[in-house]
Amino acid sequence: MQKFLIWENNMTQIDSFREEVKQWLDDNCPASMRAGADPETPLDEVWGGRKAVYKNPESKVWLDRMGAKGWTMPTVPSEYGGGGLSKEEVKVLNEEMFAIGAKTPLLSFGIWMLAPVLLEYGSEEQKKEHLPKIIKGEIRWCQGYSEPGSGSDLASLATKAEDIGEHFMVNGQKVWTSYADKADWIFALVRTGPKEPKHDGISFLLIDMETNGVSTKPITLISGKSPFCETFFDDVKVPKSNLIGQLNAGWAIAKALLQHERAFISNFGLAAAVGSKKDLVTIAKKHIGEENGKINNGFYRSEIASHKIKEHAFGLTLQRAGDEGGKASATASMFKLYGTEHNKKRHELMIAAMGTDGVAWDGDEFDDSDKNLTKAWLRTKGNSLEGGTSEVQLNVISKRVLGLPS
């Protein structure tokens, strides 16, 4: 009887919270940030930060309101600017946002990668300094991991940070730094123990991109876009207070962050598939043709059905893992591997359905949407490299999940 009363009380609290969320969203989510918005309204990919430019002013309004509520990171304790919500409350929040088609208010490496390790490894002062700015989208972060010659063998990195009293002097180069030219700060791995074994001489450092000696150079990809950069550090002075964790103990933090990165990549790919206008069925009907609402190709119908079934199963698996909670683990490598290959397969199916339009690049004879799909397909080739290659994920799975020998 007592268990039933506790359950009934919890349900009453959740129901009450749901009504609160519905009312708040109704009052605070701008019309253009919901499903059914005017298709002519400019869309923003909101990353926040000091350099942010908004085509639609309501994108900034939505970010500010969600950030002030702490709902861009709803599980983070309120003393750090988060929402302080329980898992059950977060589930309700997500359901109600989905119900009105609310747009994600903020895309952020700070949220997806840095904040979780700050909560685990950061000092109280570091949490209070950086977490509220991450949650409100005031500061945009980038990741300084890979270097020329240090990709999959990340621990061989050479960027060094020398002790010069109250500061570290940082010299070196990072590469494939996503949006470094647009970021305000970078979280970077640096070598502070040159005489230590390579895994033991690494530290985790936060660096303001406005510091003298920091420079970036965008890298043009096969898609024609330049989301990645080379990042250079030339005699960059960084306060020692920006060291996260202990000196020479950054490798454990680096690995923990990678698990969070892999988890977000797998979730991001699935969200893109579910919420994308580049739907497989729509594209197939456009390019292959349809009859009585069915795609005019039995084999392709079967391929899409199989892909959609796997997509749904993957989504349920991610949801179950999220509901179970716990720290990011090696299972993130399983999700990253599957999510990567699933996203690549989705684009391969779209390109196959498009026929010769699938190689659209320039020229008035091609639709802009077709040209964008071709470039998006090319971009997916990097999915199996970023965040750790698929081969690295297989190694992690074999050792840490299956317990196989090295």
Outline where the language-model segments fall.
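Glycine-rich beta->alpha junctions and the first turn(s) of the following alpha-helix
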Residues: 214-315, 383, 399
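C-terminal helix-coil-helix/basic helical segment that borders enzyme active sites and/or dimer interfaces
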Residues: 37, 289-295, 301, 312-365
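Glycine-rich phosphate/cofactor-binding loops in nucleotide/flavin-utilizing enzymes
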Residues: 88, 92, 113, 253-262, ...
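Glycine-rich phosphate/pyrophosphate-binding beta-alpha loops
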Residues: 175-180, 222-223, 382-387
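N-terminal glycine-rich flavin-associated loop
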Residues: 106-125, 151, 167
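A short, Trp-centered hydrophobic/proline-enriched beta-strand micro-motif
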Residues: 137-145, 189
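Amphipathic, small/basic residue-rich leader segments at the start of a protein or domain
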Residues: 2-108, 129-136, 300, 337, ...
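A short core secondary-structure module
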Residues: 158, 167, 171-217
